[in-house]
Amino acid sequence: MGDMGDPPKKKRLISLCVGCGNQIHDQYILRVSPDLEWHAACLKCAECNQYLDESCTCFVRDGKTYCKRDYIRLYGIKCAKCNIGFSKNDFVMRARSKVYHIECFRCVACSRQLIPGDEFALREDGLFCRADHDVVERATMGAGDPLSPLHPARPLQMAAEPISARQPALRPHVHKQPEKTTRVRTVLNEKQLHTLRTCYNANPRPDALMKEQLVEMTGLSPRVIRVWFQNKRCKDKKRSILMKQLQQQQPNDKTNIQGMTGTPMVATSPERHDGGLQANQVEVQSYQPPWKVLSDFALQSDIDQPAFQQLVNFSEGGPGSNSTGSEVASMSSQLPDTPNSMVASPIEA
């Protein structure tokens, strides 16, 4: 046995012609509802032998096929008086189960045409207006007391408005069913849905060859596949129309919360905030007096002390600078002779 999850493969049945009973090997097969198959040369009217194809209407009754003209002539509804059929543009009058032309809807006794609102009686021998119906009823009951109440054997009816002969109520019911059948809902599994959706994404309107391949792949009937694609296209169309309407309403959409009206906004990615201050960059430099620079240089270099002292005095010289030079001289006298005499001391934390 195969895998229970796989759909059963559809067996290709042999097509037999209903007309001649032989197998059909032709390229094209004529199918008549519900499941009758014919050769193109065997499907013809049983009365006039006219060939029937997809360009004309075919009727089946008691195993025989008829063209539209002969079927209406043989089995169509006819006027109860003139026994002539109705055209699609005719208006008719109804009396119980019988149908009449408007011109034929007359009293058989006085030939008066009955119009909507007139009372009439339908008897075995035809239509009677109320006056003639009373006369016939009295004559049938015999000569009795004229003051005795009249008990009509058949109740009177009132003529209604004429109706069109094209209404479905006047059409012959060939395949009449006593009760309305309930259509079984088809449930698709995940594999079938995946196959159908993949094909739909590639082509929402597959041709006949693609549909036949889907029938073989999914195990579904052609009708189920056709209806699924129709429903899918309808849903997508409704969804696209709804999205367009939402996009058109979005610019004019307003949000009102507790009396405050605002426009909806969409949050974007965060950006760096510069503060918005317009200022020029200022470069800060440290300043040291000249004697400080020279003192540091003397500590790190082995130079002649008198020449260095003269250089310090020269850099600090000038009018009003005697006090500064004496301070530098006294400070330099306290410095060690050479950098080699410096003793390293530990750095306190």
UniProtKB/Swiss-Prot annotation:
CDD domains, per this entry? homeodomain, LIM1_Isl, LIM2_Isl
Metal-binding recorded as keyword: yes
| Transcription regulation recorded as keyword | yes
Q: Which residues cross the membrane?
A: none
- One Pfam family of this chain: LIM
Recorded hits in InterPro entries, A to Z, give: HD (IPR001356), Homeobox_CS (IPR017970), Homeodomain-like_sf (IPR009057), ISL1/2-like (IPR047169), ISL1/2-like_LIM1 (IPR047244), Znf_LIM (IPR001781)
The LIM zinc-binding domain extends over: 17-70, 79-133
Q: Composition bias, kind Polar residues: at what positions?
A: 321-343
According to the UniProt record, one GO cellular component term is:
nucleus
Localization in the cell: Nucleus
Q: Which residues bind DNA?
A: 181-240
Which residue ranges are recorded for the region named Disordered? Answer: 312-349
**What is this protein for, i.e. what is its function?**
DNA-binding transcriptional activator. Recognizes and binds to the consensus octamer binding site 5'-ATAATTAA-3' in promoter of target genes. Plays a fundamental role in the gene regulatory network essential for retinal ganglion cell (RGC) differentiation. May be involved in subtype specialization of primary motoneurons. May bind to insulin gene enhancer sequences. Essential for heart development.
The protein in question is named Insulin gene enhancer protein isl-1
Taxonomic source organism? Danio rerio
Gene (name only): isl1
